[in-house]
C-alpha cells in the first residue's frame, strides 16, 4: 500500500472498514482509550452482464486476498484467521484492540482550549453548519437555517 512508504504514526478514535486497513498500514498504530475499530468481510453490490460480473468477482477475490495479507501480517494472524474474525464484523474498543494486536499502544490525545473553542462553518443548501476546529469533535456544534 502507498501509505507504507512513509514512516507514519496514526491515532484512531474510529477506524471502520477501510479506516481499519489504513490503520494497519501505519508504522505505529495508536488508539484512544475508548476508540473503536471495526473490520468486516469485503462486500460489494453489482449488476451487469454475467461475464462482467464473473470477471469483477475474480478481481474482488484478488483484492480480498491482498488486503487480508497486508492486515494479517501487521496483526500477526494467519489470513484465514482474520477472514473468520471479520466474517460478521469484528468490533474492538481501546484495550481490546491492543490485546488483539490491532494497535501498538493506547494514547489519549486532547485538543487545546484554543482549538476546541475556535470553529469554522460550512454552508450546505439553506443551512450553515458550525464545527469545532478540534478534529476530535466530529459532529456540528450548531446548525442554523440561513435566512
Functional labels for PLM-detected ranges:
Residues 1-147:
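N-terminal organellar transit peptides
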